[in-house]
Amino acid sequence: MRKVVLITGASSGIGLALCGRLLAEDDDLHLCLACRNLSKARAVRDTLLASHPSAEVSIVQMDVSSLQSVVRGAEEVKQKFQRLDYLYLNAGILPNPQFNLKAFFCGIFSRNVIHMFTTAEGILTQNDSVTADGLQEVFETNLFGHFILIRELEPLLCHADNPSQLIWTSSRNAKKANFSLEDIQHSKGPEPYSSSKYATDLLNVALNRNFNQKGLYSSVMCPGVVMTNMTYGILPPFIWTLLLPIMWLLRFFVNALTVTPYNGAEALVWLFHQKPESLNPLTKYASATSGFGTNYVTGQKMDIDEDTAEKFYEVLLELEKRVRTTVQKSDHPS
């Protein structure tokens, strides 16, 4: 029986690279591309099938920044499949990034230059917005939409006799200082992306505590510093092109400078081959590239309090109840 792999954000960047790499290793997979843009998804499917004709590739339209779209897409997935072996929670946004050029140049000549390059801490803020669901856009897109997707797909994911895996695309930018249980959506702060990624790490721990006994395991990874549409929103592409030689040189000291989506997907592919029971839920697995261009995976212990993770999970469940009620009322106005 073909293994079924569902990937959100599969039409570009790391998600697209992941699709190609998985099929290159096992073209007997059934990939399901969960994408917002159907035309782009169809183009990706055609390209993948042209190079891997024995594979199966299907498409589900899904916008993780819309609860209605997630629920509708999940229903379509449940009609197509009886189980999911892997769910890659990869879609995400970094909207309206504000780059602090002064802090960047100061950082280059400081002892924190490596930390700055790998986390963007201190040089990057974002202007968030509110979705039609009344939630902060970064929070809903990067975390809550995926949480609802997991909840909707539980019947396909929870099989104690044959474990399924959740694999989240997180970030080194995930910082405890940018997250608060009193403001889980980071509506009052300047770094919603960092907050959403730390929330991802928390949820990963809570999901393992609550679902391992049901045969569902969760892991988080960091792709490193990758050139994608997301990073092109921070600086123009030509600036990144000028920075490439510096980044290649720095790889001898900073293995997080993976640069290409192919390299950035290394940990995603590595996790695909691991027995989920053997993985540490408190470890973030990071894609790394050596100065000589060799890809490998490193493990980093996360700064996570398990009780906080459980409290966050409970807050998400309460938010789910509230938001579902609101959406149902909008679907059926009196």
UniProtKB/Swiss-Prot annotation:
Keywords: Endoplasmic reticulum, Glycoprotein, Lipid biosynthesis, Lipid metabolism, Membrane, NAD, NADP, Oxidoreductase, Steroid biosynthesis, Transmembrane, Transmembrane helix
Source organism (scientific name): Mus musculus (Mouse)
Gene name for this UniProt entry: Hsd17b7
Deleted gene: phenotype: Death at embryonic day 10.5. Embryonic lethality is caused by severe brain malformation and heart defect.
Metabolic or biological pathway: Steroid biosynthesis; estrogen biosynthesis; Steroid biosynthesis; zymosterol biosynthesis; zymosterol from lanosterol: step 5/6
Molecular function (Gene Ontology), one example: estradiol 17-beta-dehydrogenase [NAD(P)+] activity
UniProt: substrate binding residues: S171
Tissue distribution of the protein: Most abundant in ovaries of pregnant animals. Present also in nonpregnant animals in ovaries, mammary gland liver, kidney and testis.
Residues at the active site: Y193
Protein name according to UniProt: 3-keto-steroid reductase/17-beta-hydroxysteroid dehydrogenase 7
Listed GO biological process terms: androgen metabolic process; brain development; cell differentiation; cholesterol biosynthetic process; embryonic organ development; embryonic skeletal system development; estrogen biosynthetic process; nervous system development
Annotated membrane topology: Single-pass membrane protein
Top-level taxon in the UniProt lineage: Eukaryota
Gene3D superfamilies: NAD(P)-binding Rossmann-like Domain
Function: Bifunctional enzyme involved in steroid-hormone metabolism and cholesterol biosynthesis. Catalyzes the NADP(H)-dependent reduction of estrogens and androgens and regulates the biological potency of these steroids. Converts estrone (E1)to a more potent estrogen, 17beta-estradiol (E2). Converts moderately dihydrotestosterone (DHT) to their inactive forms 5a-androstane-3beta,17b-diol and 5alpha-androstane-3alpha,17beta-diol. Does not metabolize progesterone. Additionally, participates in the post-squalene cholesterol biosynthesis, as a 3-ketosteroid reductase.
